[in-house]
Amino acid sequence: MAGVRAVQKEKTRRALVDAAFNQLSAEKSFSNLSLREVAREAGIAPTSFYRHFSDMDELGLEMVDEAGLMLRQLMRQARKRIDAGGSVISVSVDTFFEFITNSTNVFRLLLRESSGTSQAFRTAAAREIKHFVDELAEYISYKHQYSQYVAYVQAEGIVTIVFTAGANALDMSKAEREQLKARVILQLRMLAKGADFAANKERGK
């Protein structure tokens, strides 16, 4: 019986997270969400919300954690495509833009909360983005035999470029996004050339 209750509790908690993500939009940030509206969409009474989260901030922090996890899963998915013979930069950009298209509100949350008014949210969002940079740097270092420093600088540059492009892409038409993708691919190729130059300089070449 206790096991059934635990499963039901987890399902309701999941429904609350999904409901909150669903309510985000270009006009509505997390700080504008109402506990009552989130609970209603999740199919529970507002008072039942507190059985799952102590307040809306705790719900928001869980959403930020989940967004970060999705980003890292995204990169692993891109790696599989690359290992199957795809171009590193083109595949990475395509995968990231698919994420923006398919998980728009997840990206919006990370984007907004990394520069929002809540210190706790800013810290959590920055931590998730740094995890993403760290994992990407590790992959670059392994793939190209770069030093940790050069790999980290390149990874940080990649994330800065794609996040900025992602923010711009949210309000673009499909044709405009394709043009943006082409520019981002060129920018990342330029960055890769610079990283290669820096790595060779370190090696004394």
UniProtKB/Swiss-Prot annotation:
Keywords: DNA-binding, Transcription, Transcription regulation. InterPro entries: DesT_TetR_C, DNA-bd_HTH_TetR-type_CS, Homeodomain-like_sf, HTH_TetR, HTH_transcr_repressor_FabR. The keyword DNA-binding applies. GO terms for molecular function: DNA binding. The lineage of its organism: Bacteria, Pseudomonadati, Pseudomonadota, Gammaproteobacteria, Pasteurellales. It comes from Haemophilus influenzae (strain ATCC 51907 / DSM 11121 / KW20 / Rd). It comes from the Bacteria. SUPFAM superfamilies: Homeodomain-like. This is Uncharacterized HTH-type transcriptional regulator HI_0570.
